């Protein structure tokens, strides 16, 4: 089954498939941030919630939201975002702007703040 969000066709996944995809995405972000920015940020990933505390005091809060099959992001730069997966292996795409993916948004915002641009496949 599929759904359409802001012009983006997204999958309706089984609960286990959604959790696997969302957990993989959160793990990828956590690993990339820890690897590239370990001395500049504090990272914590617990039970589907990823928190990234920036040196400038900003905090990224990223979590999976199973009822809507989305990943939600709270950004100190751009506010609240919701992302849905259009297909396994595809980027997590914004539900408000189909041209914005979770990986691109994090790469650009964290890169602008730190000078280090993350390589994310999300």
Language model segments and positions:
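N-terminal intrinsically disordered, cationic/polar leader segments
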Residues: 10-122
């Amino acid at each position: 089954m599929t759904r359409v969000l802001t012009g983006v066709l997204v999958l309706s996944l089984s609960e286990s498939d959604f959790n696997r995809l969302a957990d993989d995405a959160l793990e990828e972000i956590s690993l990339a941030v820890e690897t590239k920015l370990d001395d500049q940020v504090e990272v914590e990933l617990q039970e589907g919630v990823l928190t990234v505390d920036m040196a400038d005091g900003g905090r990224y809060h990223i979590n999976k939201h199973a009822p809507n099959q989305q990943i939600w992001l709270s950004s100190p730069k751009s506010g609240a975002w919701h992302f849905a997966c259009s297909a396994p292996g595809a980027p997590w795409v914004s539900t408000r702007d189909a041209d914005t993916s979770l990986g691109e948004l994090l790469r650009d915002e964290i890169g602008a703040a730190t000078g280090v641009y993350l390589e994310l496949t999300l």
